[in-house]
């Protein structure tokens, strides 16, 4: 069954720039009623909202400054968004970083932000609490399906997002909240441009850059187009990949009992 984006209210964390901004733009282009952008960067956030307003109309996008690693502030801001927009239909937990040097920040943002954002979405949208249900999209990465040894903490954080989402989707019948996971491949964003500077000192940054240069890069628009399709077509619990500037595809995890090996 096709999920209609038209007239839906949306929250995007980390939406001031990069892929998050493109999510907001593409959803508005597909008829979303309004998009709330949460981001730590106030000036870029305000600029992004102004640009979206010029393209789609006044009040189609609203900016809320928020550090999603601050659990108290995040909850307060989420409540403010809910009250300002008179509810939410879609929550995209996109805020993240790629910084293995500051591994505590990476875990707080990539893991903690997604977990709290998901729990807040279920608390407010969940049918078990009087809500009408909705959709959560958690942003993982293709590294959540494999490994990238140069960025150990980033990989671990995205594997966490994947496992968390796969657990949470089991409560759809009770909450009415669909849980989807998007796994972008290598995408042209500021995070990728600085990854060589964010690795641990035992990792050769030149080798990291050499590997990145050898891989196909996709524009942020390709991931955003995939996001629209995921929200429209994705069944609860589905995991989609958007990479190599190609159309998205879904993946399934095998049953471990079917791939066990003798030892």
Regions found by a protein language model. Name each.
Residues 2-36:
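Canonical Rossmann dinucleotide-binding motif of NAD(H)/NADP(H)-dependent dehydrogenases/reductases
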Residues 30, 125, 129, 146, ...:
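Active-site-adjacent segment of SDR/Rossmann-fold oxidoreductases
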Residues 32-48:
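Conserved glycine-rich Rossmann-like NAD(P)H-binding loop of the short-chain dehydrogenase/reductase
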Residues 102-107:
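Substrate-binding pocket helix/loop in short-chain dehydrogenase/reductase
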Residues 118, 157:
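Active-site helix of classical SDR
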Residues 181, 200-255:
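C-terminal helical subdomain
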């Amino acid at each position: 069954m096709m999920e209609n984006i038209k007239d839906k209210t949306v929250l995007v964390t980390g939406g001031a720039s990069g892929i998050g901004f493109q999510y907001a733009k593409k959803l508005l282009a597909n008829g979303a009623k309004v998009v709330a952008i949460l981001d730590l960067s106030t000036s870029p956030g305000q600029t992004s909202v102004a640009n979206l307003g010029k393209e789609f109309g006044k009040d189609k996008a609203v900016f809320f400054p928020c550090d999603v690693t601050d659990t108290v502030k995040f909850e307060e801001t989420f409540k403010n968004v809910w009250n300002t927009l008179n509810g939410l239909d879609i929550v995209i937990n996109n805020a993240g970083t790629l910084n293995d040097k500051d591994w505590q920040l990476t875990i707080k943002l990539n893991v903690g932000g997604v977990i709290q954002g998901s729990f807040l979405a279920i608390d407010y949208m969940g049918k078990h609490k009087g809500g009408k249900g909705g959709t959560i999209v958690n942003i993982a990465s293709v590294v959540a399906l494999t490994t990238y040894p140069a960025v150990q903490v980033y990989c671990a954080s995205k594997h966490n997002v994947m496992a968390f989402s796969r657990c949470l989707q089991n409560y759809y019948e009770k909450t009415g909240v669909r849980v989807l996971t998007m796994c972008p491949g290598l995408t042209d964003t500021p995070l990728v441009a600085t990854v060589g500077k964010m690795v641990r000192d035992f990792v050769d940054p030149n080798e990291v850059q050499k590997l990145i240069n050898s891989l196909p890069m996709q524009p942020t628009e390709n991931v955003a187009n995939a996001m629209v399709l995921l929200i429209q077509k994705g069944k609860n619990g589905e995991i989609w990949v958007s990479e190599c500037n190609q159309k998205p595809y879904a993946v399934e995890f095998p049953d471990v009992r079917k791939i066990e090996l003798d030892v």
